């Protein structure tokens, strides 16, 4: 058999025909797998690889190594870097140290919240209730009405007429006759009352009535009503009514009867116990003070026994019975209008008017006999009234 002649340009490396363009991307022999291989450049069989596989300067296969990755003795090693809090390095594991309210849940970093904080749409937010509002990215109080802010940004109550803020208290700012202690009330004087229906009412006495227009008028009753003239005030009492040296140690009878511009006075006093039963001093003084309206002030005489003779009502506003402040100037004890009389051979009696800085006063003085009970005779005096 004759041997086939081989051409001079025959290439024994498959594919043998290097001048023809292959019709498929890989033209390796059918007994070679295309996995991991490629023809690059054409006609050259080469490995097909991607990062991190590469070749070194010696055209050897090797790996691209990043930070903290080393190749020692043919083995890859990872070096855990030095960390700073909150990162941790434990058993070659990188971790994150957390504290409340930060926690790790389901392998994720999360934020623990409590009302009114909440997480909504992956955002931390706050639930604002009534009276609160978020304005300009800030939580603020939503005031209305009389509430507002002062110049320091503090919440305040704006108080208008009739009210004021005193420290931490809201106070009614009232003038008399209003009074505000625990509640708003009215100060009532004689002639006024509050009815059971809560209305302010004028108290009408005998002979008075309301007309059809609600005005006070004299009653048109056919009965004749007489209003007694208050001409006498006295301190008559069946029991002790005067405290000179001790409580209720004397009984004082003082009677003032008005007649025009004059008042006739009668006075007697009797000691009942203690030092008044055996006098140690040779004189005794008793002062009865009154205010500018003629009301008896606190003194030796019990005020409940100082009454009008005609009605037996406690005497009040008895200005018409007071010593005239022009005739008897206040605190002028040597004024000639004062009286000094001899009421018995051994006892003298005097009365000084208006021995006081304001208001009115009677100052009665008796001489006394030491060692004997104090019971001087009745004395009579007269003076000009204020009205």
From Swiss-Prot:
Task: Give the InterPro entries listed for this entry.
Answer: Adeno_fibre, Adeno_fibre_knob, Adenobir_fibre_prot_rpt/shaft, Adenovirus_pIV-like_att, Attachment_protein_shaft_sf
Single GO biological process annotation from the record: adhesion receptor-mediated virion attachment to host cell
DNA-binding among the record's keywords? no
Gene3D superfamilies (alphabetical): 6.20.10.20, Adenovirus pIV-related, attachment domain (2.60.90.10)
Keywords assigned by UniProt, alphabetized: Capsid protein, Host nucleus, Host-virus interaction, Late protein, Viral attachment to host adhesion receptor, Viral attachment to host cell, Virion, Virus entry into host cell
Q: In its keyword annotation, does this UniProt entry include Mitochondrion?
A: no
Q: Which domain of life is it from?
A: Viruses
Subcellular locations according to the entry? Virion; Host nucleus
Q: For this UniProt entry, what's an example GO CC term? A: host cell nucleus
Primary location: virion
Specify the inducers: Expressed in the late phase of the viral replicative cycle.
What does the record give as the function of this protein?
A: Forms spikes that protrude from each vertex of the icosahedral capsid. Interacts with host receptor CXCAR to provide virion initial attachment to target cell. Fiber proteins are shed during virus entry, when virus is still at the cell surface.
Task: List other remarks.
Answer: All late proteins expressed from the major late promoter are produced by alternative splicing and alternative polyadenylation of the same gene giving rise to non-overlapping ORFs. A leader sequence is present in the N-terminus of all these mRNAs and is recognized by the viral shutoff protein to provide expression although conventional translation via ribosome scanning from the cap has been shut off in the host cell.
Q: Family per UniProt? A: Belongs to the adenoviridae fiber family.
Record remark: domains: The tail region anchors the fiber to penton base capsomers, whereas the shaft, built from several repeated motifs, allows the knob to protrude from the virion.
Quaternary context: Homotrimer. Interacts with host receptor CXCAR. Interacts (via N-terminal tail region) with pentons.
Name-wise, this protein is Fiber protein 2
Provenance organism: Human adenovirus F serotype 41
